[in-house]
Amino acid sequence: MPEEHEHTASAVGGCLCGKVRFEVHGELLSVVNCHCSKCRRFHGNVGAYTSTQRENLIMIRDEGLKWYRSIHDETPNVHRGFCKACGSSLFWDPKEKKNISIAAGVLDAPTNLKTSRHVWVDQKGDYYEITDDLPQNAGKFERANGENQ
């Protein structure tokens, strides 16, 4: 990775095998835990996402990056990014919005992020309980800036 990027990135992350690496140059929003059936299938459990403006995401290595267009999501025209080599679930990209969501677990530590809420709790799996006091939404959550997660 070029040295000039190391000092300007607010976050760095990537997949398990290293064939996808990226930097975020800008603000990352708080983590939102998505309990919808699509995120649970994509991640194998709850989808924990942060997000940033699309132009803040800089791909350093993307030879493994593959996009799946999810036509059955509640949000139309969503693309889910994953590594085709190792299978890591990486991105949730609603093309009509200005932000792209990044799976919080693929960010290198320390992230300094905090979880702020749960969404789509009406679809949560029956094999776990939500035991914190964070706000819960039955459906999607619209941030003040109009972005949803």
What kind of region is each of these model predictions?
Residues M1-Q149:
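A short Gly-Trp-Pro
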